[in-house]
Each structure stands twice: as structure tokens, then as C-alpha cells.
């Protein structure tokens, strides 16, 4: 019995390494060909070196166990990750640019290209494995008690649809708690209509309180929660019928403390909302999967997230010290140990349709994200206590949040200088490569999504020029607002 299980584990490990190696090698060859035929073959060296480092890192450290990844902590260290993602591209770029006497804007371009390509090698193989090769988690024999908490403030237009989707969700004996956070519209009246549908299978509870914010509403709901597992759903989200049962499956593993749901855009009606939809799809399929396999999904979204109730209680509930309480509670749970995974079931939510509303939403998100990263900066000073959070989750999240926006603004500045100096044609090939890369990534993400509208591909170029710059501007502003300690009201003006 033991010998057979051991042999099976070895075979699974070999299969995993082979998949990662072949996926990485395919991407490596593809990018090398793109760079070569783009008449920028010299940059291939700067691209290949960090890519090889990343591939080697993945191959030599991966072990598959219990549907997730565990790593040899003697091999896997933060410096190795930073070497592959940051240090090696910088060194490669400096050496190559010095040898071939590149102009300053060419140096920036040659640095930015490897940085972009490395992210593909680091994320894409794991994303492909998680999507197509990872075995599905089986439904546990014992169905745990479940509580769904819906914090609501002035949600008269959305709450009814949300509650209907929860009540109709396929899960036995669930408790539904609606917390009206001092709404001034008909939110409470709408919530009360669904109380008559309360039954032995759907125990329904409405709590009314003075306005205190989402964190206080959730904390109050937790006081009345009877479920071993608590799922928190925003009042403007609509969940799939199988979402609750799919989410609970992951909690059969005792070390899983939370599960992040998938979000899809419901109101795709203009350019902005379609760009947001594509951004969400790419983030879910290409970026989140590696974090899930490592057990360190860094954000359990408010649209739909599941938690082991005792884990939240142990970490002191939700905190109002940042603007993104969802990110903060996720970090607190990760610091306390255990895994946080991502799931494939979906909740649908509406996104802003105007630039003004989009700015208001994102400035709050990004300010809150940076506040949370600073609040938990002690993770970087601890070598062993926080495990994969210290070695992978936090440094990668911090790096990808801060560095890309400034790099993007820098490349735009140098491009303007090049155009004004009459050498703008030298930027044509890098721009074409970036555009092709964006289209390639978008098509992969849409294909991995499955039932998705391929018309979103038409919005892919805006991920390079347009939508991307709007997001980067808001991120940069949010960083400086936090560092300068500007109040949120000042930011919102």
C-alpha cells in the first residue's frame, strides 16, 4: 500500500516537472523567435537569462501534494525569486547596453522587455497546469454548516438579485445573514421581503445597525454566524448555483483557512467596462493561479470569499485601519499560517461605467492595497515564520504593484524624447512586440476562461496603450497619497 502510493507520488512529481519544463521551454522559444525576427535579437540575451533562471527555479523546487504545492525551504528563498525577476534583467540590460552603446531610451526599452517576458515564464506554466492538469477537488462526505453574510449599504437596486441567487444556490441547511449598515434607501425593506422564504434549509436573519462601514457590518454578522464556514458576498454580486458547494469542497483540507471566489463583469456595455472585464479575466487565469498553487492567494475578494470562522476569530476579525479590509484580513490569515486557495466558480458583479466612478473605485482600492502592504511590511523581516508568504506571496505582490507603473511612465517619457529627437522609428519594433505579446496573453486568458466572448480581444491593445496608463496613473497617485498621508477626502476631490 505504502509502496504503491509512494510510486504514484513520484510519477506525479515527474509529470508535473515535465509539464512545467515543456510549457516554459515552449514560451522561451516563442519569445526568442519574436525578438529575433523583430530585429532586436541582441535583447534575446537579456530575455533568456532571467527566463532560464525562473524556469530552473520552478523545475527544481516543485512538489505536488494534496492538490497544492509544497517547497523545499532550503532551496526556495526570496533572493532566488528576486534574482530571476529583477536583478538578472537589470544586470543583463546594463551589460548589453554598455557593449552595444545603446541610447538611454533603448536601455529602458531593453530592460522593460525582459521584465515583461519574465512574468510570462514565471506565471504561465503554473497557470496552464492549474487549469488543465490539476485534479479537481472531490466533494467531502461531511457537509459542514455554512453561513452566508451579506453586508449592505444603500443597495436597493441590487440586493434582491443577490439574495435570490444565494437562496437558490445548491447547498443544504445554509444560514443567510443580511447586515443593513445604516442604509438610507429601501435596502432594509427589500431584505425583509425575503424573510418569508426562510425555511429549515434557508435560515434567514436580518440585522440593522448604524452606519459604520463594511468591516463593522461583517464583524457584527460573524457574531450571529452559526456556520463552521462563513462565505461573505457583496450585496451587488450574483453567484452561480453551484458556487457555495464548490467553495466548501476546498475546506476539507484542514490547513485551508480561506478560499477566494472568481469574479466576472456583469454589465459590459462600453469600452471601459469591457477593458475591465478583460483585465479581470487575465488576472484570474494568468496571475492568480500560481498564488493558489502556492497556497498564498493574496486577496480574497469581497464579491465572494469563504473563510473558516475560527480562523477569522483567532486573528481579531476585520479591521478598519485600511481602505481594503478584504486584503487586510487575507494578509492576517496568511500570517497566522494555513493556505488560501482560489476556486473556479463565479460571482457576477457590476463595474463602473464612467471614468469618474472608475477613478473613485480604483483610488480607494489602490490606496488600501498600499496601506495594507505597508501595514504588513514586517513579513519581509521574518525568515521562516511566514513561509511562502515571506518567500513568494508578499515580495511578488509588492514588486508587481509598485515597479510596473513607474516603468511604464518612464518608457513613455523616453519614447516622447525619442520622437522629439527624430529617432522615434527605433521604438516601432518594441511597440509591435508588446502589442503582439498583449494579444497573445489575452487570447490565452480568454481561451482558459472557456465560455467567454472573443470580442474582448478587440480591447486588448488598450492594455498596452490607454487603459493601462489610466490604471498606472491612479496607482502612482495612490502611492504618493499614502506616503504624504493625504486624507481620503482630499484624494477624492
What do these predicted regions represent?
Residues 126, 210, 215-217, 221-223, ...:
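Long helical/loop segments within the catalytic core of UDP-sugar-dependent glycosyltransferases
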Residues 1-142, 448-449, 471, 481:
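N-terminal membrane-anchoring/stem segments of glycan-assembly enzymes
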Residues 172, 180-189, 211:
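A conserved acidic beta->alpha catalytic loop
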Residues 160-161, 185-194, 218, 242:
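Acidic helix N-cap motif at the loop->helix transition within catalytic regions
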Residues 164-173:
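Short, acidic, metal-binding catalytic loop of nucleotide-sugar glycosyltransferases
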Residues 57-64, 80, 90-114, 396-485:
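Membrane-embedded multi-pass helical conduit in multi-pass membrane proteins
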Residues 144-147, 175, 313, 328:
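Cell-envelope/extracellular polymer assembly enzymes that use nucleotide-activated donors
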